[in-house]
Curated annotation (Swiss-Prot):
Gene Ontology CC entries for this record: mitochondrial intermembrane space
Organism of this sequence: Leishmania braziliensis
Annotated [4Fe-4S] cluster binding sites: C81, C84, C92, C95
GO MF: 2 iron, 2 sulfur cluster binding; 4 iron, 4 sulfur cluster binding; metal ion binding
Protein known as: Anamorsin homolog
Length: 119
């Protein structure tokens, strides 16, 4: 048995393949669905969204149970991720509280120090 004289390439790095247009692949129904699923950000609302994933809903339920939730709701820290109170390990890159210790989320970034004597 002899091998064929010519070989074919399965791919080539030299020729550039045309890239498919993503918008051409979507139907009108897909575009409407995509616009409808864009949710609002919890940071712009007074209360947590119905389908909250940032942890604000759990925090509000906990504060409501303790009776600490003000009637206007809680204000999220300016970072927007909702993890500013947890500490540097959980904060986003543009968090204004980077480098500060963890704090209670109801205190708006104020850290309580115990300045009493230990003696």
């Amino acid at each position: 048995m002899s091998t064929p004289a010519t070989t074919t390439q399965a791919f080539s790095l030299k020729t550039r393949q045309p890239i498919a247009d993503e918008d051409a692949l979507l139907t009108e129904e897909d575009r409407i669905l995509k616009q409808a699923t864009k949710g609002e950000d919890c940071t712009t609302r007074r209360r947590a969204c119905k389908n909250c994933v940032c942890g604000r809903a759990e925090l509000e339920r906990k504060l409501e149970a303790e009776g600490k939730l003000p009637p206007e709701g809680i204000t999220m820290p300016p970072g927007g991720c909702g993890n500013c109170a947890k500490g540097d390990a959980f904060r986003c890159a543009n968090c204004p509280f980077l480098g500060q210790p963890a704090f209670d989320s109801t205190e708006d970034g104020k850290v309580k120090l115990n300045l009493t004597d230990d003696i």
